[in-house]
Each structure stands twice: as C-alpha cells, then as structure tokens.
C-alpha cells in the first residue's frame, strides 16, 4: 500500500523519483475499503461519475461524453440497476464494483487496485478477479494490484512484484513460480 501511494503521488518517496510517463489524471485508483467509504452518502451514479472530477479543475459537472462513459462502466460491471440507490446501502461486493467503475472513469492508461477483494466472499472475489482480468485485456489498461492472495495473482497476473521483509522479486509469473522466493512463500 505504501508503494502504491508513492506511485500515485500520495506519499513522497524517501529518496529517488517515480516516473510513470503518464499524467496523474490518466490513473484510476481503487483504495482499500475503509469504514468511511462504506458509509458514503451519495448515489451510485454520483460516486461513479466522481471518477471524472480529477480532470476538471473548477468545473464540478460531467460532460455528456463522461456521463455516457459512466453508464457504460456501470453496464460493464452490472451495476446499472443500482444507479439511483444510496452507496452505503449496498453489499461489500456491490460497493467494490461501484468504486471499480469510478476508477475506470478516471483511468485512461493505468488502474491501481489496493486489495480490491478484501472482505469479499469467495464467489464475489473470483468474479472481481475475472472482471479485472477482462478490463486489462479488453480495454488495454495496465493494472497494478496489491494483493496478499499470491495464488490468485499467479492465475491472473502477467508479472509479479513480491515485496517481503528480506527479499524482493520482479518477473513473469513463470519466472516467479520457479524462483526461490515463491518456493519459500508457497510451501
């Protein structure tokens, strides 16, 4: 989570620089769920459309094109029927889909997901991983995801960055599976 926040410019690195080659407003971010998020007093549609607000400095309204994209993202995530419901009345899985739709409205090049399935039941978790994989493949959006679920990461990711207390690994899933890091971690 600290690395993610540094990539997003929310935390300043202790040393060095992080260069992404894209603008901050081209990044969608789905943070870890918090109690404050769970009690957000807005409609689903308002939450999803708020993903565009990083693009507007002083103009708090969405354009027609942005509203169409918000509807398209809600359709993709199968939450259209929830558009007028209050966000805080939704289940945890529905709330995560809403925030994923919001992040997709913000994203043009990169989406950063910080523990997107924490607290979700196994069926909803598997569905979220499938949706995220589909987004990556169909929309050609790079996905960076923090997860403690290494087995799911090996199933859905193309590359693994394993950051431990004493070691760090970065490489393809196949390289990771053959590494000493994976052998120690997965036993």
Predicted regions and their residues:
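Conserved ABC ATPase signature
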Residues: 86-90, 94
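H-loop (His-switch) and adjacent beta-strand-loop-beta switch element
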Residues: 160-172
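Helix N-cap at the start of a conserved alpha-helix in ABC-type nucleotide-binding domains
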Residues: 122-124
């Amino acid at each position: 989570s600290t690395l993610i926040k540094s990539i997003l410019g929310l935390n300043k690195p202790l040393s060095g620089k992080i260069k992404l080659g894209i603008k901050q407003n081209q990044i969608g971010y789905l943070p870890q769920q918090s109690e404050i998020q769970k009690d957000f007093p807005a409609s689903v549609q308002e939450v999803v459309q708020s993903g565009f607000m990083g693009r507007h400095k002083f103009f708090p309204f969405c354009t027609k094109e942005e509203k169409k994209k918000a509807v398209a993202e809600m359709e993709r995530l199968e939450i259209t029927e929830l558009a007028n419901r209050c966000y805080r009345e939704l289940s945890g899985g529905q709330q995560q889909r809403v925030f994923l739709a919001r992040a997709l409205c913000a994203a043009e090049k990169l989406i950063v997901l910080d523990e997107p399935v924490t607290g979700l039941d196994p069926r909803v978790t598997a569905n979220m991983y499938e949706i995220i994989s589909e987004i990556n493949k169909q929309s050609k959006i790079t996905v960076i995801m923090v997860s403690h679920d290494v087995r799911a990461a090996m199933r859905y990711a193309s590359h693994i960055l394993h950051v431990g207390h004493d070691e760090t690994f970065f490489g393809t899933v196949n390289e990771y599976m053959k590494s000493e890091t994976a052998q120690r971690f997965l036993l």
